[in-house]
């Protein structure tokens, strides 16, 4: 839905403090499992386990009463279904994600009503859940069948199996004849799956046995001990780390390892169990930190983020391959790659060996290749980690090529995110727009993919973080829009907006500046950086298009002397605006650092103007420079350092003055100058060839007769790739540069802007190419999904005037009524807290006298309709 948050800074910080109090990432006793979304389906299966099977039926009670309580308290009060989390989405199997959500809700609701039916409690919950199933099954299975007439594998297995169990327990559903035919088709599909697949298959990440809880017993009953017990995980006693499958395994075998696993699970997760256990606890915490940073909230949680990263780094080590079950390996690889990326981004010394161990194990690679859908998030995490590649890291290069190939094979799941990752390199993405994408992505809180659905961070945390991020984003938008208006007034004041030639890029420059910088820097210095970029654009166009050589020479000399009194027309306008920018920058530095840098700034600008004049002179004389000569001048004329150094001087701590002198720049600055120049050349060689100008691509082709233009482009791209890796290493590794970290961040932001401008095309020179991004960054309200309507059912769902009586659920009731409480003395209900309530009493309208007439009727008598012939409904056990 569209959101519009009119937050003030105080409102945001109050919300931040509220969330910090709940999340407590820096708490040393933090339980990571509190961040994981519970699974209604798996919790329902644990609730069905009997504590002791060697007792009479009327003495049976659940082993895990808390799981039954969770079901009673977590039904959607309005619609009657159960689900896992707010923005719940399932593994798409090549299908529409929202459709898969409906399928998962349907199977979860079926499991929950089966659990209530088994324990003969929660009549109102059971009634609402049954009604949801009857109302929605036809729509769900009819809408989401694929073109081949089949359903996702997991759904065909789970839906049919849980439906069989429901029938065995006496639950009957009223479906249309069309719906029944579709369900029959699903049973046929399941039969084909069973005939085609083995119970346990080394190549299948989730083999049939992972769905033990819903499999026909004939598949394993003759050799139950060998099939089930031997498949239990030697490390934890689970069946494929699936609580539901392990619950079924325990009910069938009463195996002590299963019991220990289940008891440990419930102790660790008392408020609903996740669909996978155990989980990598570092992965949970890193995923929470990743969500915070990726949605633009890192500025509020700096202490908490550093605490988590320091914890992870203290356990960091280079790993050689260690054999373990594939589900553990997948989590380990996901955690290791995410830790590598986050630790490297935060300046820690980490080696690619920490996660590239998988490259040397063919079995692991085979699993990844054969189960791309199941491991897609792991593959994506590895690919993202390779964004931060330093020179000589050949393992990272191999991992990048390998994972990119896998991602290109399977783009249907999280397609938008994958396409974004593959088409737009991380180095060419701007912070502010990336934050928006993560905020709007309903799958941003996903941890992993399991049997049927995404395992997610708990919605009670991720939803609040998402809405805080949305409010923060629109708060920033409002600030940026006001600043852009002020910047536009400045451009008009100095006559730059109607100068009559060149590119008018006020909005482009401001957009690129503030969306690339951290918000703290953007709001302090973004407008000044944009002024610098605007003037560079106009001056560059003046040298390229408008000015005579005498005009250009006169302006350059005026800048070198810093005396513009004799300038006229365009030269005068440019110099006066330049003088204003330099004075503002110098005054700001003097205020913050009590130091004068005006001479350094003038020298940097003088060097830039000289490089433009030199290019104009080469063009006028038809001079063909050497490659070295061209690069030495071109890396100055692109003027990336002019922007970066001007703003770096304002950072805290102050930029080293000796690094401001032309010819004595830091290695980071030098690399920043080279990369944008070559990026620009890749997109401008055709235009410059037509104008008779030189370019690194054209020079390389000229110096190597016989080469095609594609060969020269590939050569320049290779140089850029090498310089980019070197640049990243100098920015991210402490000790390779004397520059303070904030100054490195300014250089990184500046580089990312040029990478964005020249990613596959020249976006900066286009009048329309960036308009969509500008709208999203500065104007359009953010799109966020509604918070969940799932709320605990109140103890008395219909107020003090009514009570709800449990029904005899092994036969269909004629009528369900509410009767005045005083007619039953001290009788209590068990509606919300699912304690076993075993007094089964039906209240019929004919049994009531005039004094106790029913107050409300909720369901009337319906004739039970057999769903299908018994051949389609074999017993579960």
From Swiss-Prot:
Protein keywords = Cytoplasm, Lyase, Magnesium, Manganese, Metal-binding
What are the required cofactors?
Mg(2+); Mn(2+)
| Keyword Secreted applies | no
Q: Which residues bind Mg(2+) 3?
A: 680, 684, 688
Q: From the UniProt record, list the reaction(s) this protein catalyses.
A: (2E,6E,10E)-geranylgeranyl diphosphate + H2O = (6E,10E)-geranyllinalool + diphosphate
Q: Name one GO biological process term.
A: response to herbivore
Is Manganese among this UniProt entry's keywords?
yes
Q: According to the record, what induces this protein's expression?
A: By methyl jasmonate, coronalon, alamethicin and in response to the caterpillar P.xylostella feeding. Induced by infection of avirulent and virulent bacterial pathogen P.syringae.
Q: How is the cofactor bound?
A: Binds 3 Mg(2+) or Mn(2+) ions per subunit.
Q: Where does Mg(2+) 2 bind?
A: 540, 544
- Any GO MF annotation of the entry: magnesium ion binding
- A cellular component term (GO) from this record? cytoplasm
Q: In which tissues is it expressed?
A: Expressed in leaves and flowers.
Summary of the knockout phenotype: No formation of (E,E)-geranyllinalool and TMMTT detected.
Residue ranges annotated as motif DDXXD motif: 540-544
Q: Where does Mg(2+) 1 bind?
A: 540, 544
Primary location: cytoplasm
Metabolic or biological pathway = Secondary metabolite biosynthesis; terpenoid biosynthesis
UniProt function note: Involved in the biosynthesis of homoterpenes, attractants of herbivores parasitoids and predators (e.g. predatory mites and parasitoid wasps). Involved in diterpene (C20) biosynthesis. Catalyzes the conversion of geranylgeranyl diphosphate to (E,E)-geranyllinalool, the precursor of the insect-induced volatile C16-homoterpene TMTT.
Which protein family is named in the record? Belongs to the terpene synthase family. Tpsf subfamily.
Q: What is this protein called?
A: (E,E)-geranyllinalool synthase
- Origin organism of this chain? Arabidopsis thaliana
């Amino acid at each position: 839905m569209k959101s519009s948050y009119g937050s003030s800074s105080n409102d945001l910080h109050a919300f931040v403090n509220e969330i910090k109090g709940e999340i407590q990432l820096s708490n040393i006793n933090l339980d990571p499992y509190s961040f994981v979304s519970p699974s209604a389906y798996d919790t329902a299966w644990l609730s069905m386990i009997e504590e002791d099977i060697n007792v009479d039926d009327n003495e049976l009670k659940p082993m895990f009463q808390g799981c039954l309580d969770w079901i009673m308290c977590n039904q959607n009060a309005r619609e009657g279904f159960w689900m896992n989390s707010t923005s719940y989405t399932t593994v798409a199997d090549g299908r529409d994600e929202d459709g898969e959500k409906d399928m998962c809700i349907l199977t979860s609701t079926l499991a929950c009503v089966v659990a209530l039916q088994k324990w003969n409690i929660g009549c109102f919950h059971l009634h609402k859940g049954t009604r949801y199933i009857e109302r929605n099954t036809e729509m769900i299975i009819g809408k989401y069948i694929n073109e081949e007439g089949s359903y996702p594998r997991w759904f065909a297995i789970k839906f049919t199996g849980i439906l069989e169990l429901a029938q065995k327990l006496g639950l009957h559903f009223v479906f249309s004849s069309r719906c029944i035919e579709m369900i029959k088709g699903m049973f046929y599909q399941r039969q084909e799956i069973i005939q085609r697949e083995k119970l346990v298959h080394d190549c299948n990440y989730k083999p049939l046995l992972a769905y033990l809880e819903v499999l026909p017993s004939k598949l394993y009953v003759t050799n139950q001990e060998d099939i089930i017990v031997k498949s239990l995980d030697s490390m934890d006693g689970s069946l494929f780390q699936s609580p539901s499958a392990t619950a079924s395994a325990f009910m069938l075998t009463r195996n002590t390892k299963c019991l220990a696993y289940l008891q440990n699970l419930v102790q660790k997760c008392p408020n609903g169990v996740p669909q996978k256990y155990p989980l990598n606890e570092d992965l949970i915490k890193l995923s929470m930190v990743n969500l915070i940073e990726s949605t633009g909230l890192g500025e509020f949680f700096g202490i908490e983020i550093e605490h988590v990263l320091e914890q992870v780094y203290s356990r960091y080590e280079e790993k050689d391959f260690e054999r373990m079950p594939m589900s553990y390996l997948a989590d380990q690889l996901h955690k290791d790659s995410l830790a590598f990326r986050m630790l490297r981004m935060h300046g820690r010394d980490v080696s690619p060996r920490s996660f590239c161990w998988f490259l040397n194990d063919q079995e692991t690679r085979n699993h990844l290749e054969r189960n791309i859908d199941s491991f897609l998030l792991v593959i994506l995490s590895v690919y993202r980690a390779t964004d931060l590649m330093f020179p000589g890291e050949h393992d990272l290069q191999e991992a990048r090529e390998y994972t990119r190939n896998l991602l290109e094979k399977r783009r249907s799941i999280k397609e938008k995110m994958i396409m974004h990752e593959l088409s737009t390199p991380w180095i060419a993405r701007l912070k502010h727009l990336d934050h928006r994408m993560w905020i709007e992505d309903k799958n941003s809180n996903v941890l992993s993919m399991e049997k049927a659905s995404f395992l997610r961070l708990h919605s009670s945390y991720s939803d609040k973080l998402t809405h805080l991020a949305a409010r923060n984003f629109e708060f920033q938008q409002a600030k940026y829009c006001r600043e852009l208006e002020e910047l536009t007034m400045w451009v008009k004041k100095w006559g730059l907006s109607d100068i009559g030639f060149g590119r008018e890029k006020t909005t482009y420059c401001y957009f690129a500046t503030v969306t690339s910088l951290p918000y703290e820097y953007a709001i302090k210095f973004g407008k000044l950086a944009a002024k610098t970029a605007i003037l560079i654009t106009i001056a560059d166009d003046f040298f390229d298009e408008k000015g005579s050589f005498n005009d250009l020479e006169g302006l350059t000399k005026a800048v070198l002397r810093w005396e513009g009194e004799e300038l006229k027309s365009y030269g005068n306008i440019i110099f006066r605006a330049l003088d204003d920018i330099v004075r503002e920058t110098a005054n700001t530095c003097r205020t913050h650092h009590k130091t004068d840098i005006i001479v350094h700034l003038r020298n940097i600008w003088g060097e830039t103007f000289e490089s433009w004049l030199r290019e104009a002179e080469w063009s006028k004389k038809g001079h063909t420079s050497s490659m070295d000569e061209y690069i030495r001048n071109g890396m100055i004329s692109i003027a990336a350092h002019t922007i970066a150094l001007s703003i770096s001087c304002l950072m805290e701590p102050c930029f080293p003055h000796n690094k401001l002198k032309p010819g004595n720049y830091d290695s980071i600055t030098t690399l920043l100058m080279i990369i944008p120049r070559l990026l620009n050349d890749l997109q401008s060689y055709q235009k410059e060839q037509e104008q008779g100008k030189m370019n690194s691509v054209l020079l390389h082709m000229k110096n190597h007769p016989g080469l095609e233009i594609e060969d020269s482009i590939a050569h320049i791209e290779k140089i850029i790739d090498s310089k980019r890796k070197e640049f990243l290493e100098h920015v991210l590794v402490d000790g390779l540069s004397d520059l303070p970290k904030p100054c490195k961040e300014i250089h990184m932001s500046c580089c990312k802007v040029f990478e964005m401008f020249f990613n596959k095309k020249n976006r900066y020179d286009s009048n329309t190419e960036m308009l969509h991004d500008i709208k999203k960054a500065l104007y359009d309200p953010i799109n966020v999904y509604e918070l969940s309507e799932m709320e605990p059912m109140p103890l008395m769902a219909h107020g003090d005037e009514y009570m709800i009586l449990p029904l005899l659920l092994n036969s269909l009731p004629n009528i369900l009524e509410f009767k005045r409480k005083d007619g039953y003395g001290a009788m209590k209900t068990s509606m919300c807290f699912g304690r076993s309530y075993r007094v089964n009493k039906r209240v019929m309208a004919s049994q009531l006298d005039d004094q106790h007439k029913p107050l409300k009727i909720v369901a009337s008598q319906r004739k039970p309709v057999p769903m299908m012939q018994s051949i389609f409904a074999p017993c579960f056990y």
